[in-house]
Amino acid sequence: MSLIDTRIPEPKRFISGATGDWEVVIGMEVHAQVTSESKLFSGASTSFGAEPNSNVSLVDAAMPGMLPVINLECVKQAVRTGIGLNAQINLKSVFDRKNYFYPDLPQGYQISQFKQPIVGEGKIMISVGPDNKGQFEDVEIGIERLHLEQDAGKSMHDQHPTMSYVDLNRSGVALMEIVSKPDLRSSDEARAYLTKLRTIVRYLGTCDGNMDEGSMRADVNVSVRRPGGEFGTRCEIKNVNSIRFVGQAIEYEARRQIAILEDGGSIDQETRLFDPVKGETRSMRSKEEAHDYRYFPDPDLLPLEFDQAFVDALAVDLPELPDVKKQRLVEKQGISIYDASILVTEKAIADYYESVAAGRDGKAAANWVINDLLGALNKAGKDIEESPVSPEQLGAVIDLIKEGTISGKIAKDLFEIVWNEGGDPKKLVEERGMKQVTDTGAIEKAVDDVIAANPEKVEQAKAKPTLAGWFVGQVMKATGGKANPQSVNELVKAKLGIEE
């Protein structure tokens, strides 16, 4: 990770210590498992959750004489990701051996890329906020590189009281290591960065981003310094597997380092682990330098070379990425940047919204998708793909409101019925007598009844016209939400003698 300072110190990002302000500096190395049916250098399956050691080829097990063969699809996925990160695609890259010993690394080295990665510098834009004024801030974060490498196996220490086991299913699975520049200055920025990166690779289809399955993991480099000072000694927090934990780990680690420095101590450059139960980091080992791994070009693999036409062909087929989609939704659907930002967080959510909004009011569709649908999904712990309410059903609910068939309140009840029981919203309205009351005579009687029952409120409303809203609410309550709200409002004001 290069150590070039590109950010101007911002007081709102500072951390207050006992002896003054401090600034946290964060860089991230994200390991994203490449979406591919087979591994980086073998034909073994990459399926998740298989029986231990059932997805292992002779290459993965490092049997003597077995040679690696590059998986072209993994190369394409890395290039696609590089394009999505607005990065330089290197037409020539080299695979290197990273030498270290660990039981789950059968070769005794990892095939990675060191000096000549497949993807060079790039950038992504993150949105941080909202602040206390409801505003978001766009921050550009530099990408230093993306390189391809093998994953290691998995050591298991909880299967036997005196022995450890090794599962090599993951050994040889293709990873993209995406290295940011040290441009992040808060835990909020780090969370926003990781969220945006996951969104991009999911849109591209190059990684599923499922952190709970280990297909996306983050190594977080944290240091602190006085604002505008030299970079401090950094500690690396390894293999953090959730966006929330990334934020917690940074906040704890920054405070830990500040406390040591303010007490006159110094920071040891080391690798640490985050304990999500205790919410703290703990020392794992001293931090290695590049020379400790004795990198050298892998003699079993030729340099990886392709031409610009190869890159251009992949670029043509890329899907619309979140930033472009967000801008299009703002311009075409007339929704706010805030709403568009929520809708494009997941491609599946954006696709759902666009299906609902097709031929309808974009703002109304956004309100229903964000507030009602996503709220219900979040409460139920479901993903958008598991939604009991289809885009067609939600669109039908919105149509019924626009047509004046049901009121907004009844629409909420109808949504809940469709969520729990399914069915055609239009038929449900007919069958359950949920149609809005548009009979002026019936509405007028309800208004008269409410006014007659509340003479004191009538006098107050004449002095304070805003109390008309209270009468409207009482009428809607009396009619079970079926009365047309606009008709009720007009009648209430007329009866109370309140001018528009």
Swiss-Prot record:
Q: Which Pfam families match?
A: GatB_N, GatB_Yqey
Keyword terms of this UniProt record: ATP-binding, Ligase, Nucleotide-binding, Protein biosynthesis
Report the catalytic activity: L-glutamyl-tRNA(Gln) + L-glutamine + ATP + H2O = L-glutaminyl-tRNA(Gln) + L-glutamate + ADP + phosphate + H(+); L-aspartyl-tRNA(Asn) + L-glutamine + ATP + H2O = L-asparaginyl-tRNA(Asn) + L-glutamate + ADP + phosphate + 2 H(+)
Relate the assembly described in the record: Heterotrimer of A, B and C subunits.
The protein here is known as: Aspartyl/glutamyl-tRNA(Asn/Gln) amidotransferase subunit B
| Gene Ontology terms, MF aspect | asparaginyl-tRNA synthase (glutamine-hydrolyzing) activity; ATP binding; glutaminyl-tRNA synthase (glutamine-hydrolyzing) activity
Provide the E.C. number(s) assigned to this enzyme.
Answer: 6.3.5.-
Belongs to which family? Belongs to the GatB/GatE family. GatB subfamily.
What does this protein do, in the record's words?
A: Allows the formation of correctly charged Asn-tRNA(Asn) or Gln-tRNA(Gln) through the transamidation of misacylated Asp-tRNA(Asn) or Glu-tRNA(Gln) in organisms which lack either or both of asparaginyl-tRNA or glutaminyl-tRNA synthetases. The reaction takes place in the presence of glutamine and ATP through an activated phospho-Asp-tRNA(Asn) or phospho-Glu-tRNA(Gln).
Record NCBIfam families:
gatB, PRK05477.1-2, PRK05477.1-4, PRK05477.1-5
